[in-house]
């Protein structure tokens, strides 16, 4: 028998709609870093927790995203795998829109922020 998973999906700009997971139940999770809101659904019998990075109403600007609360909430819900989508721009003409990129460098401006 295949073990059922608890999967977290973090959607960025352009990936705010989780309707593919059927009927969704909103959840608010309390964390030491503040509240995180997500939607719970199912897919192929697995529990899916959809977290909209910019909020369910897309009202949170990038510099105000509470990343620590979001990740803590998924951990608290028992999520063991996370699939995260994001959309960014590029100044490199060799990377036209629609190019799939795996990053090897990261500038993290979220340190020491609650």
Positions of the model-derived regions?
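Metabolite-binding pocket within alpha/beta catalytic cores that recognizes anionic/polar moieties
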Residues: 2-114
């Amino acid at each position: 028998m295949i073990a059922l998973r608890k999967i977290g999906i973090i959607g960025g700009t352009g990936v705010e709609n989780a309707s593919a997971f059927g009927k969704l139940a909103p959840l608010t999770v309390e964390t030491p870093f503040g509240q995180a809101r997500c939607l719970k659904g199912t897919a192929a019998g697995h529990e899916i927790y959809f977290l909209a990075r910019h909020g369910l109403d897309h009202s949170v600007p990038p510099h105000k995203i509470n990343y620590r609360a979001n990740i803590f909430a998924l951990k608290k819900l028992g999520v063991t795998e996370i699939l995260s989508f994001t959309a960014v721009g590029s100044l490199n003409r060799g990377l036209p829109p629609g190019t799939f990129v795996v990053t090897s460098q990261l500038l993290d401006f979220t340190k020491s922020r609650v």
